Amino acid sequence: MQNSKKRKLKPQNLLIVLACICLIIGTFVVLLSNHSTSNSDSKAKTGNKHYETIATVMIDAGHGGYDGGTIAEDGTTEKDLTLALALETGKQLKKLNPGIKVVYTRTSDKVTWPEDETEDLKARVKMAKKEKADYFFSFHINSNEDPTCSGYVSYIRQDDKASEQITEYICKNLSGLDWTHDRGTLTTEFYPLHVVDEQKIPAILFEAGFSTNTKEI
């Protein structure tokens, strides 16, 4: 068994990652503010105040528990990086608009599903349906034997116009940062992904750079 180490991000990399998260959040807020018919009929709670829920966003931290995902040279696991990104995104999203209800597939390394890849993926889709999510966003981190491989990539369904619009905003904004480059927006028609394909709502799987490239993560 390999020991999972917590990587300390370099200050400049951390700032870039947080900036990316904020840009993604901003994209969601714009779209959600114009979302007139939400599946949600509940109220979001912040502190002692209650707000009408304008939409529910499920944030998925890829992998977790038995599944560490990709592993960087220093031992950092993908599951730790995606969890950090997911929690920070949710935190900032709720801060920017308390009317947005944020739910997660996991908030720690503990997972509630069996140690089976198929059941793992099914469980994430079921959770989105149970929470009546309006949007599903899954964080992943890429890796490659070549440490110079870089860039971020988005995966969406071919007929998912809302997610196509979201990814366009993300790519447009990220292109202005001195971080990394866009590897494109790919449809699951050619790259099947259960957590995206089985959703009936806008769904994106976003690979935020390469864990094997220390200039990115």
Predicted features along the sequence, with ranges:
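N-terminal Lys/Arg-rich, disordered targeting/topogenic segments
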Residues: 1-13, 20-22
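Hydrophobic membrane-insertion alpha-helices, especially the h-region
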Residues: 15-31
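Generic recognition of cysteine residues
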Residues: 20-22, 149, 171
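Active-site-adjacent substrate-binding region
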Residues: 161-187
